[in-house]
A protein has these predicted regions:
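Phosphate/diphosphate-binding loops
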Residues: 9, 15, 393, 398-403, ...
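N-terminal export/assembly segments and adjacent metallocofactor-ligating motifs
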Residues: 1-235, 246, 253, 273-274, ...
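Active-site phosphate/pyrophosphate-binding segments
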Residues: 228, 246-361, 507
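Long, contiguous, secondary-structure-rich segments that constitute the structural scaffold
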Residues: 452, 458-502, 506, 570-583, ...
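Short beta-alpha connecting loops at secondary-structure transitions
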Residues: 209-216, 425, 440-452, 573
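A glycine-rich phosphate-binding loop feature that marks nucleotide/adenosyl-phosphate handling sites
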Residues: 245-248, 327-338, 478-491, 606
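Extended redox/cofactor-interaction regions of prokaryotic respiratory oxidoreductases
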Residues: 117-187, 192-199, 222-226, 312-417, ...
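Glycine/threonine-rich phosphate-binding loop and adjacent beta-strand/alpha-helix elements that clamp
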Residues: 159, 428-451, 466
Length: 668
């Protein structure tokens, strides 16, 4: 029996980007475990990846191209050959381009894989085709906009520096579910006596590893940050020398903004008692190395960018930015280690085509004109359940005149609406290059098993489509490994000093940031820009979240057992999650005459979704929580939480507002 242990990388949209060891027996992955030699993840995996082989070799894997034979959404298909599938797609597209123009075609993708090649494989093809462009802003562009408004391109601290902190604030992040390896440094700091706080909208699993949890009203986090700054200034718990040398706009903030954020006012906005706010400010102001870990969820409100901007400004007042073990950790841009324009190939565009925001797919499919969307090509995403305003998305996908192609591993809800379904490889079956937004490691991954069935990678499919569409550019004739080799042949400052020998062996290797990178503030002024004259609001301020007419704020939160809609094919994980729950405070449930375990319906102006009610004191009054995105076949009413979320965008960054919606709840 041929047993081999091979290295790979977790491909999913998670900051941890774990190193994997895959046990392969006779060409089949039989076990997946963590790579103990990975510098950051150190051999541990989340429950989703611990049995990744069950996803890779699932009996539900798509193994052949399929053509629709029934109504859209019915899931009725017949097998066809790859040759026939590619031929049909190319013929349909050529006809559409002749009749409507190339902008009638829209690609839709996001981070189904984070590999630099396979994730971005469609960009050069669709640029060359002249298709409509997709504004890929569904996750956290508002967080990036908020950070950049203050810090520019200044890098965040290394996540392992958390071990050197004496106060760690997990602000708007359920780290156990979404960033579990960051907790390694948190636990080390706690052993040394550091205090650990969680600021969130409800008691999450992460509450179990912190010293204290502070629950705030959804969308009010910016007010809390301003209130803390008000008290730091009032009590002179600020670093005057650091402010004078490194901060632009402190005096303006002090005079024009902070006087309006006394504890009593902040208490009304956040729901925290004034005394608690004062205690938080004293502890933060007296800490020697306070570190804030900012979660992406904070940015998924109408005021998301401003909220992040305000929180990121807070450490500047106490001189925490630039000191080891302190400051603010948002994300790390390690993709800058590679010249990605060599993969994107924007130079293939003959003109800039229209840009369509992916959060407004429902609007695009149903209302866009001149031309209307006539074809949708979906890869690395499942918009039927992950895009907001689900009813509008499904309405658009149901259009008989919409030619939809879906490249997928499973018969997802989106695939059920496709005209052509193409089987996709898993990360263990293709080559790619990985970096992380949660640590500084980069790693090259080779296939560890052959493709399952007739599945093909993103790059292989786009190469076939390029040939079918008559593209002559040599670029499309390369392999994924050719593209990786090309990226590695171009030196960049971020890769200086990289351990090339270890990297070539397929192991994760850390990028080496200059020691002074965090105090060379990469902004136009060279300072932390609390005052940013280029922003619509030059100073950080409090912008309220969107108001709704319904009594409960809906938190569409992440699940411990899934990653958005990924892993929903796994019955073992679904059994652990048990059901599609809606969490509600006991007092609210009592006022409505509702009991735990009963069928309920959450509803608003966009739609209604059945849930099983879970009554728990972990959720504050006037808030309800729905964790995870379920496939519709597992949802009690054939709808999931995004039937209740709006297509509205954030204040900056044009991001999603998944956390900024209101609902009411009734008995089911």
């Amino acid at each position: 029996m041929g047993i081999k242990m091979k290295r790979s990388v977790c491909p999913y949209d998670c900051p941890d980007a774990c190193g994997l060891l895959v046990e392969v027996v006779n060409g089949k992955a039989v076990r997946v475990k963590g790579d103990s030699e990975h510098p950051f993840t150190r051999g541990t995996l989340c429950p989703k990846m611990n049995r990744y082989q069950e996803t890779v070799h699932s009996p539900l894997r798509l193994t052949r191209p399929l053509m629709r034979t029934g109504a859209k959404g019915s899931g009725l298909f017949r097998p066809i050959s790859w040759e026939e599938a590619i031929k049909q797609i190319a013929e349909r597209w050529r006809g559409m381009i002749a009749r409507y123009g190339s902008e009638a075609i829209l690609p839709y993708s996001y981070a189904g894989t984070m590999g630099l090649i396979q994730r971005n494989a469609g960009h050069p093809f669709f640029y060359r085709l002249g298709a409509s462009r997709l504004d890929r802003t569904i996750c956290s562009p508002a967080k990036q906009a908020g950070w950049k408004a203050v810090m520019g391109e200044t890098p965040a601290p290394h996540p392992d520096e958390a071990a050197e902190s004496d106060l760690i604030i997990l602000w708007g992040i359920n780290a156990i579910a979404t960033n579990i390896h960051f907790l390694h440094g948190v636990k080390q700091a706690k052993k040394k006596g550091a205090r650990i706080w969680l600021i969130d909208t409800y008691q999450t699993l992460t509450s179990s590893v912190v010293d204290q949890t502070f629950l705030v009203q959804p969308g009010s986090d910016g007010a809390l940050a301003l209130g803390l700054m008000h008290l730091l200034v009032q009590w002179n718990l600020i670093d005057h020398d650091f402010i004078t040398t490194h901060v632009q706009g402190f005096e303006e903030l002090k005079e024009k903004i902070l006087p309006d954020f006394r504890p009593e006012q902040v208490s009304q906005l956040t729901g925290l008692p004034s005394g608690v706010i004062e205690s938080m400010a004293k502890t933060y102001g007296k800490a020697k190395r306070p570190l804030i870990r900012v979660g992406a969820g904070l940015s998924r409100y109408g005021n998301g960018a401003m909220t992040i901007r305000t929180i990121v400004s807070l450490p500047a007042l106490v001189g925490a930015h630039g000191k080891r073990g302190s400051g603010c950790f948002s994300s790390i841009n390690t993709s800058g280690a590679f010249v990605m324009k060599e993969i994107f190939r924007e130079d293939f565009m003959t003109k800039a085509t229209r840009l369509i925001n992916m959060n407004q797919l429902g609007l695009a499919l149903n209302e866009l004109k001149d031309p209307s969307i006539q074809s949708l090509y979906v890869y690395c995403s499942n918009p039927a359940v992950v895009a907001p305003d689900q009813n509008q998305v499904l309405k658009g996908l149901s259009r008989e005149d919409l030619f939809t192609v879906v490249h997928e591993r499973f018969m997802t809800d989106t695939a059920r609406y496709a005209d052509i379904v193409l089987p996709a490889t898993s990360s263990l079956e293709h080559s790619d290059l990985y970096c992380s937004y949660g640590h500084t490691c980069v790693q090259r991954a080779q296939p560890v098993i052959s493709p399952v069935g007739e599945s093909k990678s993103n790059w292989e499919v786009f190469s076939l489509l390029a040939r079918a569409m008559g593209f002559e550019e040599p670029f499309f004739k390369q392999t994924a490994d050719d593209l990786i080799d090309h990226l590695l042949s171009i030196p960049t400052p971020m890769r200086e000093g990289l351990d090339e020998k270890t990297f070539a062996a397929g192991k994760a290797v850390e990028l080496l940031f200059p020691p002074d990178a965090r105090i060379r503030f990469q902004t136009p002024s060279g300072k932390i820009e609390i005052l940013n004259p280029r922003e619509p609001h030059p100073l950080p301020c409090y912008l309220p979240p969107y108001e709704g007419e319904y009594p409960f704020r809906l938190m569409a939160a992440p699940s411990f057992y899934a990653l958005n809609s990924t892993f929903r094919e796994r019955e073992d994980l679904r059994k652990k999650e048990k059901a599609m729950f809606l969490k509600m405070n006991p007092a609210d449930a009592g006022a409505k005459g509702l009991k735990g375990g009963q069928d309920v319906v959450a509803f608003n102006e966009l739609g209604e979704v059945p849930f099983i009610l879970q009554v728990t004191p972990d959720v504050p009054r006037r808030v309800v929580v729905a964790e995870g995105i379920w496939w519709l076949e597992h949802a009690p009413g054939n709808r999931s939480v995004n039937a209740l979320t709006s297509q509205r965008l954030t204040d900056r960054g044009a991001g999603s507002t998944f956390y900024d919606n209101t609902v009411d709840v009734k008995s089911g």
